[in-house]
């Protein structure tokens, strides 16, 4: 039930472990900070991270006549979250499903969740170009996917896989809103200087190659990691950080590219 959603954005990456879920959660919190009503849908069925990252583990999902009611992070219901993590009895329980069952669950998430009026629905996806991604694109044909944000790290091994994700987007007709380079440099927690411990500018070169916007470069910042398990936005806790600056830039870009 996405008829009340103005903008649907999928967050993709061809490589696992690039911080895609962290980008999804902090982007959702940044959009909320800017006065938008936001939904965050975690369709990484085998590795749902969103409930943990927002400190929502153990929360219950309820059903009403219109379908599943998402978990809200605040009383004003400005951020709604849905994840298979809420349906598992134990965080360590594996999801051992074949493709058809995964497809059915994702279709339920996209059609049977009672999203109220939302300015943005952020969909956090698993890595790669699997059944899950194809199902999402098929289900979004009616309401439309307004674009994808692709997350990468600067290493060449990640960039190779992300190039495949770009090809997937082009073949399925997904508009690429831009590329975010994550884990580029390390921010010292004491002096806040940033040191490039890996190669750098991989996201910039990839954006140039794909002819899409480069939305920003995020460093490894231990202070941001401490926020995991809370609903605190980087914009509130670390307003002067590079991460907050980049997230603010992404929000401003989305406001100009999409319907507010």
From Swiss-Prot:
Function: Component of the cytosolic iron-sulfur (Fe/S) protein assembly (CIA) machinery. Required for maturation of extramitochondrial Fe-S proteins. The Nubp1-Nubp2 heterotetramer forms a Fe-S scaffold complex, mediating the de novo assembly of an Fe-S cluster and its transfer to target apoproteins.
UniProt-annotated binding residues for [4Fe-4S] cluster: 188, 191
Protein name as catalogued: Cytosolic Fe-S cluster assembly factor Nubp2 homolog
Cofactor note: Binds 4 [4Fe-4S] clusters per heterotetramer. Contains two stable clusters in the N-termini of Nubp1 and two labile, bridging clusters between subunits of the Nubp1-Nubp2 heterotetramer.
Predominant place of localization: cytoplasm
Family the entry assigns: Belongs to the Mrp/NBP35 ATP-binding proteins family. NUBP2/CFD1 subfamily.
One matching Pfam family: ParA
Record's GO cellular component terms: cytosol; cytosolic [4Fe-4S] assembly scaffold complex
CC cofactor: [4Fe-4S] cluster
Subcellular locations according to the entry: Cytoplasm
Record keywords, A-Z: 4Fe-4S, ATP-binding, Cytoplasm, Iron, Iron-sulfur, Metal-binding, Nucleotide-binding
Self-association and partners: Heterotetramer of 2 Nubp1 and 2 Nubp2 chains.
GO molecular function, one term: metal ion binding
BP GO annotations: iron-sulfur cluster assembly
Source organism of this protein record: Drosophila melanogaster
